[in-house]
UniProtKB/Swiss-Prot annotation:
Family recorded in the similarity comment: Belongs to the chaperonin (HSP60) family.
Gene for this chain: groEL
Subcellular localization(s) per the UniProt record: Cytoplasm
Reactions mediated catalytically: ATP + H2O + a folded polypeptide = ADP + phosphate + an unfolded polypeptide
HAMAP family: CH60
Enzyme class: isomerase
Pfam families membership: Cpn60_TCP1 (PF00118)
UniProt keyword annotation of Iron-sulfur present: no
Reported function: Together with its co-chaperonin GroES, plays an essential role in assisting protein folding. The GroEL-GroES system forms a nano-cage that allows encapsulation of the non-native substrate proteins and provides a physical environment optimized to promote and accelerate protein folding.
Name the UniProt record assigns to this protein: Chaperonin GroEL
Binding, ATP: T29, L30, G31, P32, D86, G87, T88, T89, T90, G413, N476, A477, A478, D492
Length: 544
């Protein structure tokens, strides 16, 4: 396919048009008075959102060179979202400002490599200063503030803070769509996995259709149980203890299942059988997790154990087990704290090494189940369109909160970027490097300016006043007042601000050092199909 090539100024100008188109669509959403953007969907109702990365991913421009510029800035939003989970609009605004300022200087004759060095120096200094001024997040109220600012909804802030308090900072918090209008929190304490009872005859509560076992023994194996003789020795020991039994096995079938059900119905003993969760290596790991949590052993041939040799000592114990048609929940396992901590450490190490997003998610789930539980935020709304928009906002708030727990918080509303202004301005440099530093200084003002513009105010006036204020004092665009941002609870996670700045600078530096752009030439329209008027179907009647 033939290629279209543009050089130097012409190439950069074409790409800049794409950058501006995308950034202008995204930046209207910034701040407490930011607006929404409506995205057309091929199927279903349009999506209304103020999430920067969602908007950026949807934008596709007709001109190939403009589209490349737009895609570069979309990459800033996407990367920031991957690292910090929020701050994508801020990252886009910063990138646009750096690219625009940088191009002015390149056009005026500045050396792009010198500018790049200056930009990199300035960002390193800004990130160091952000670390210095960030404060660790303390208590439920701080978490609620971070989440409420991100979602622009205090109720969501409270929900997320409560969820994190209940399941711990490492706990898994998932989002589900609710059938109702309200958004509510549902916390599953203990370890839950998605396998239900092998037979409905095993239930103990016919109203709720669930089996509840108090202080049960737990037999954990990766084998199929089809012959009752295999588990008879251990069954007899459990019956003598007068306790119920939960069997977790690859499968319980045939004669073994029939015998267990008959004895359960006769009242000889209380037993529930469930299939082991997961598949393959993940199943082995999850069975091991359950064993450590309940203080039992996995009875597996890999360790030279068979079911006939199992004793009460090799079984796990728990305070309570609830088994429904679809889920099994083990609460208050009696495993030793040291072993559980060691297992958590092991999973954390695997989390750091894995590159697969799917594996990361599964490891995070296992970690949460061992560390305390799973919280589910059920998102409700009046219409499907509102539901999708609300879900995106809560997802951002959740990511923001996790980022705040990791690296602390800084003053929100773009104030923290202005607070590092003096530090960046004090860097000693000459020539094009100094110009590169000035490009970053100009970009640091941009988020505050845009927040003010979206609130219907003159951005430059707010920026100039902010330069003279003490660290931490900023402009609350929601009320139009000047306040101490940290004390008022208008905060951003340091990680989000840092990621936005670093990613914007990275793409801007690459953009400015571009000298040629290559794109596919658009193909001429394909000729239309020839007229088929002479091919009437009348003569084919005899084929019917």
């Amino acid at each position: 396919m033939a290629k279209d090539i543009k050089f130097s100024e012409e190439a950069r100008r074409s790409m800049l048009r794409g950058v501006d188109t995308l950034a202008n669509a995204v930046k209207v959403t910034l701040g407490p008075k930011g607006r929404n953007v409506v995205l057309e969907k091929k199927f279903g109702s349009p999506l209304i959102t103020n999430d920067g990365v969602t908007i950026a991913k949807e934008i596709e421009l007709e001109d190939a060179f403009e589209n490349m510029g737009a895609k570069l800035v979309a990459e800033v939003a996407s990367k920031t979202n991957d690292v910090a989970g929020d701050g994508t609009t801020t990252a886009t605004v910063l990138a646009q400002a750096m690219i625009r300022e940088g191009l002015k200087n390149v056009t005026a004759g500045a050396n792009p490599m010198g500018l790049r060095k200056g930009i990199e120096k300035a960002v390193v200094a800004a990130v160091e200063e952000l670390k210095t001024i960030s404060k660790p997040i303390e208590g439920k109220s701080s978490i609620a503030q971070v989440a409420a600012i991100s979602a622009a909804d205090e109720e969501v802030g409270q929900l997320i803070a409560e969820a994190m308090e209940r399941v711990g900072n490492d706990g898994v918090i998932t989002l589900e769509e609710s059938k109702g209008f309200t958004t509510e929190l549902d916390v599953v304490e203990g370890m839950q996995f998605d396998r239900g009872y092998a037979s409905p005859y095993m239930i103990t509560d016919s109203d709720k259709m669930e089996a509840v076992l108090d202080n049960p023994y737990i037999l954990i194996t990766d084998k199929k149980i089809s012959n009752i003789q295999e588990i008879l020795p251990v069954l007899e020991q459990v019956v003598q203890q007068g306790k119920p039994l939960l069997i977790i096995a690859e499968d319980v079938e045939g004669e073994a299942l029939a015998t267990l059900v008959v004895n359960k119905l006769r009242g000889t003993f209380n037993v529930v059988a469930v299939k082991a969760p997961g598949f393959g290596d993940r199943r082995k790991a999850m069975l091991e997790d359950i064993a450590i949590l309940t203080g039992g052993e996995v009875i597996t041939e890999e360790l030279g154990r068979d079911l006939k040799s199992a004793t009460v000592e090799s079984l796990g114990r728990a305070g309570k087990v609830v088994v429904t048609k679809e889920n099994t929940t083990v609460v208050e396992g009696v495993g030793s704290t040291e072993q559980i901590e060691a297992r958590i450490g092991q999973i954390r190490a695997q989390l750091e090494e894995t590159t697969s997003e799917f594996d990361r998610e599964k490891l995070q789930e296992r970690l949460a189940k061992l560390a305390g539980g799973v919280a589910v935020i059920k998102v409700g709304a009046a219409t499907e369109t509102e539901l999708k928009e609300r879900k995106l906002r809560i997802e951002d708030a959740l990511n923001s909160t996790r980022a705040a727990v990791e690296e602390g918080i800084v003053a929100g509303g773009g104030t923290s970027l202005m607070n590092v202004y003096t530090k960046v301005a004090s860097i000693v440099a000459e020539g094009d490097e100094a110009t590169g530093i000035n490009i970053v200084l100009r970009a640091l003002e941009e988020p505050v300016r845009q927040i003010a513009i979206n609130a219907g105010l003159e951005g430059s006036v707010v920026v100039e006043r902010l330069k003279g204020e003490k660290v931490g004092v900023g402009f609350n665009a929601a009320t139009g007042e000047w306040v101490n941002m940290l004390e008022t609870g208008i905060v951003d996670p340091a990680k989000v601000t840092r990621s936005a700045l670093q990613n914007a600078a990275s793409v801007a530096a690459m953009f400015l050092t571009t000298e040629a752009v290559v794109a596919d030439k658009p193909e001429p329209n394909a000729p239309a199909m020839p007229d088929m008027g002479g091919m009437g179907m009348g003569g084919m009647g005899g084929m019917m």
